[in-house]
């Protein structure tokens, strides 16, 4: 099997928005195998570390679960230190011959930080508290940025749930690998 470019993940959309003391991650439910939809209600969002961390994945499902397990192990070694746990995971991802072949990306968030862990082992903190990955990620990101800016400029008082659901719905209308069966997890302080 030829290793694909991890920056070109197909088949899902994961979006994270942070505002004040709240962070929310949403993922669509579609699982595709080639051009065929296999499942419409998959859960690509998961809580870790006694529900203090939420994460979503794009890419190969088995690879993502391997990364969830590794991240959970790092969080046990570094409780309450999400950035450090993610950097340690990224180091392993780059150095380990087996892990380097994994084709997945993750968004990880706790009450204080949101991070993207790329398929290349990069750990990135998004600007403006908004991050997206997957085939519909750019559409969801653009929609979320527009909604957040509109909310801020015109004092619309849009909830995070409304903002993220609307952005995901827009992405699902554009990306054929994303559906509108949206699953949301939230952390608020």
Curated annotation (Swiss-Prot):
It is an enzyme of class 3 (hydrolase). InterPro entries: ATP-dep_Prtase_HsIV_su, Ntn_hydrolases_N, Proteasome_sua/b, Proteasome_suB-type. It catalyses: ATP-dependent cleavage of peptide bonds with broad specificity. One of its GO terms (cellular component) is HslUV protease complex. It is found in: Cytoplasm. Na(+) binds at residues 172, 175, 178. Its EC number is 3.4.25.2. The active site is at residue 12. Transmembrane segments: none annotated. Pfam families: Proteasome. GO terms for biological process: proteolysis involved in protein catabolic process. PROSITE patterns: PROTEASOME_BETA_2. Keywords: Allosteric enzyme, Cytoplasm, Hydrolase, Metal-binding, Protease, Sodium, Threonine protease. Its main location: cytoplasm. One of its GO terms (molecular function) is threonine-type endopeptidase activity. Allosterically activated by HslU binding. A double ring-shaped homohexamer of HslV is capped on each side by a ring-shaped HslU homohexamer. The assembly of the HslU/HslV complex is dependent on binding of ATP. Belongs to the peptidase T1B family. HslV subfamily. Protease subunit of a proteasome-like degradation complex believed to be a general protein degrading machinery. NCBIfam families: ATP_dep_HslV (TIGR03692), PRK05456.1 (NF003964). This is ATP-dependent protease subunit HslV. It comes from Ehrlichia canis (strain Jake).
């Amino acid at each position: 099997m030829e290793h694909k470019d991890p920056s070109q993940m197909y088949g899902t959309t994961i979006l994270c928005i942070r505002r004040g003391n709240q962070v929310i991650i949403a993922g669509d439910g579609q699982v595709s195998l080639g051009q065929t939809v296999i499942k419409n209600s998959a859960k690509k969002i998961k809580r870790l570390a006694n529900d203090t961390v939420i994460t979503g994945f794009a890419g190969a499902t088995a690879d993502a679960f391997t990364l969830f397990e590794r991240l959970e192990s790092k969080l046990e070694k570094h409780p309450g230190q999400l950035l450090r746990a993610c950097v340690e995971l990224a180091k392993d991802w780059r150095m380990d011959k087996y892990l380097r072949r994994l084709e997945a990306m993750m968004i990880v968030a706790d009450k204080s930080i949101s991070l993207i862990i790329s398929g290349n082992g990069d750990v990135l903190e998004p600007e403006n508290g908004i991050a997206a990955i997957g085939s519909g990620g750019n559409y969801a990101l653009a929609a979320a940025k527009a909604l957040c800016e509109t909310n801020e400029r015109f004092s619309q008082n849009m909830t995070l749930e409304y903002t993220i659901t609307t952005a995901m719905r827009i992405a699902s209308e554009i990306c054929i690998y994303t559906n509108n069966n949206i699953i949301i997890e939230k952390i608020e302080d």
